[in-house]
């Protein structure tokens, strides 16, 4: 019955529901969206950010500069009227130090308040740094949540799936975003 004909509207789609349940169990998450309509990692990140943030909210990247494609979504490059910044969302960035988080700056900034979402990019992207391992991710999430448990922690986990024993949602991340175009961890991020 998982392969029954469907309308395309998502009603009574047992196969999709089962697939998403499997994904949520594998990644230790409350729920999962696994959809062919989400075309890429950047598309998934865009949907997530616009779904979680609204006018006046502040987003902070704690792993330095994001991927080039995400920069235009945020409004750091290009001149899109549809960027987060053009929609009134504030963006801040904290750089990594020696392939690790700047824990002191992060803690200091979190204590100041007025943060809706903290984003971190697990893979190195186009930079020369190493990918962030799960222990570092767990440590920084723990420090943030000790100060403010209501801040949403979002991990850009593209290229990070199945490369370690735990996933970001298993160490305190509220949400992680990934791409099915990438080979779920078989790449060399």
Q: Which residues does each PLM region occupy?
A:
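Generic structural marker for isolated residues within well-ordered, non-membrane alpha-helices
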Residues: 20
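Conserved PLP-enzyme active-site core in the AAT-like
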Residues: 2, 9-14, 31, 39-189
């Amino acid at each position: 019955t998982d392969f029954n004909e469907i309308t395309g509207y998502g009603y009574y789609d047992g196969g999709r529901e089962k697939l998403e349940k499997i994904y949520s169990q594998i990644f230790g998450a409350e729920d999962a969206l696994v959809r062919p309509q989400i075309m890429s990692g950047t598309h998934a990140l865009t949907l997530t950010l616009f779904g979680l943030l609204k006018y006046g909210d502040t987003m902070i990247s704690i792993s330095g500069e994001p991927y080039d494609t995400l920069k235009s979504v945020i409004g750091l490059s290009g001149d899109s009227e549809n960027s987060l910044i053009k929609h009134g969302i504030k963006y801040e960035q904290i750089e990594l130090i020696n392939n690790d988080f700047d824990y002191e700056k992060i803690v200091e900034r979190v204590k100041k308040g007025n943060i809706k979402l903290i984003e971190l990019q697990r893979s190195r992207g186009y930079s020369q740094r190493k990918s962030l391992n799960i222990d570092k991710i767990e440590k920084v999430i723990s420090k943030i949540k000790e100060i403010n448990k209501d801040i949403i922690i979002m991990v850009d986990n593209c290229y990070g799936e199945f490369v370690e024993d735990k996933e970001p949602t298993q160490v305190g991340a509220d949400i992680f975003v990934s791409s099915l175009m990438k080979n779920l961890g078989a790449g060399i991020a």
